Amino acid sequence: MTKEYATLAGGCFWCMVKPFTSYPGIKSVVSGYSGGHVDNPTYEQVCTNQTGHVEAVQITFDPEVTSFENILDIYFKTFDPTDDQGQFFDRGESYQPVIFYHDEHQKKAAEFKKQQLNEQGIFKKPVITPIKPYKNFYPAEDYHQDYYKKNPVHYYQYQRGSGRKAFIESHWGNQNA
């Protein structure tokens, strides 16, 4: 199997895993921390907004089965790309959305998708999700991995109570909500 990586942030990483898991070609989705200056950060450190890291997921995928463009299509249906101050009721640096590109193809695909969404006018405000070069990724603690499976009731309450589910449904219907 050929494999590539997509590293994406869209607020709380608990809500960024499940939407990707049912698509062919996606081999794994790992919750973690990306983009900062502290090696091997802990959740507690990242939450202080002093590490430079954001909560992110790293997706391992087979490019012969699915494309980075398909992953971006899923990604933009999981969060509010018009808010760069955090996501829903999670505010601050560690919850900012970011696309971390691994190569020039990913950078161009992300720029194109962002432009396309702005031209389509799906959102009332412009899509402003930053596109940055990939620097690092550190897996989060085990209790954060596959949170939606380990804690389904809390996951559902969190997704609903934060406003994420309602936002996604209002823009995309029940896809990924």
UniProtKB/Swiss-Prot annotation:
Keywords annotated in UniProt: Oxidoreductase
Q: Where is the active site?
A: 12
At the top level of its lineage, which domain of life is listed?
Bacteria
Q: What is its EC number?
A: 1.8.4.11
Provide the catalytic activity annotation: L-methionyl-[protein] + [thioredoxin]-disulfide + H2O = L-methionyl-(S)-S-oxide-[protein] + [thioredoxin]-dithiol; [thioredoxin]-disulfide + L-methionine + H2O = L-methionine (S)-S-oxide + [thioredoxin]-dithiol
* Disulfide pairings: none
Purpose of the protein: Has an important function as a repair enzyme for proteins that have been inactivated by oxidation. Catalyzes the reversible oxidation-reduction of methionine sulfoxide in proteins to methionine.
The UniProt similarity line reads: Belongs to the MsrA Met sulfoxide reductase family.
Query: What is this protein identified as?
Result: Peptide methionine sulfoxide reductase MsrA 2
The species this protein belongs to is: Staphylococcus aureus (strain NCTC 8325 / PS 47)
Tell me the classification of the organism that encodes this protein.
Bacteria, Bacillati, Bacillota, Bacilli, Bacillales
The gene from which this protein is expressed is msrA2
